[in-house]
Amino acid sequence: MQNQNASLTGLQMLQDEMGRQHKDALSSFHLAEPIAVEIAASLKNTGRLMLLGMGASHWVNRIVEPAYRAAGIDATAQVISEYLRAPIAGKPMTQILTSQSGGSGEIIRYLDDTPDHTHFFGLTLDSNSPLAQRLPSLIGAGGVEKAFAATRSILISLALHAAVLEKLGLPQDQLLAALSNPVECDDAEAVELLAKSKCIIFSGRNLLQGVADAGSLCLMELGRIPTLSLEGGQFRHGPFEVLKPGIGVILLAPVEDESDSVKRLASECVAAGMRPVLFDLRGGEAPEGCVTISLPNRPGMGGAAEAVVAMQAALVKAAALMVPEVGTPLRSSKVTNGE
């Protein structure tokens, strides 16, 4: 496998990861049950969850943070490098440390600096990693992610969290349906538009804001352009002043009632002379002037999974038009130590 990966381009490695992510995520969900039961029991005991990670792992945590709150858990997602410097004191809490490689420098330092690992759990794609060896861990199926930017690892991580959420009483039928029935979107117009942008703003609501955050990181890594991710309300409170030709806008509209506010935001972007790309889970009438990508009508984690897959497909295609040798990093590595 190592020799095979060495012969693949960065783009081919990304495509390989995305091509098997639904199957691996579905397997991950079903294989996670024993540890998911343990984590759910811990959460019922503490009532408090700290989600810690770096890079795309942190943005996965941001996606699922509202879902845990909906399950009655006091959940917070924090960048672990920040948490190392300003930990939250107080009552006991369950902690899930996420690292697709299981070897992130910040994760290792945190485990070294924190002697008591009661109510600590890991989430990783590598069963032989330091994280998996030191903590009871949710393990993703299919092995570690080889491509530079996170694609498959995001969907697998969502599936692993979904296994825990189901044990907390939140049914995951919609997520399982999304994983069992992959959908290909007609994104050609959106890809062409995004590939011409010099900077792109991402925005969503609720779980889809974490999806927007993950997309923003993905395009910085692959397209090598500046991006900014702002929750819908934050985007409207001042940053609208940056809108001008050359800036792209990506909006994500959920099934839930928040969809109306996202579509109003899309209309306001059009009025400002923009042509936003709208990933729409709700359906109905799309705002005029948008490039709309219609997705299956799924709420909650199912909707997040649909949005993740559709957005990453469009972003990888756009990035391939922006830079040569897309997916081959110039200044970064897959496993990083910022400490």
Indicate where each model-derived feature is located.
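Short secondary-structure boundary segments
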Residues: 3-7, 65-66, 109, 219
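Active-site phosphate/pyrophosphate-binding segments
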Residues: 10-48, 137-250, 258-259, 321-339
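An N-terminal domain-start capping segment
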Residues: 1-3, 35, 108-109, 195-196
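Phosphate-moiety recognition in structured ligand-binding domains
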Residues: 2-13, 268-339
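Glycine-rich phosphate-binding loops that contact phosphosugars or nucleotide phosphates
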Residues: 44-186, 205, 240, 245-298, ...
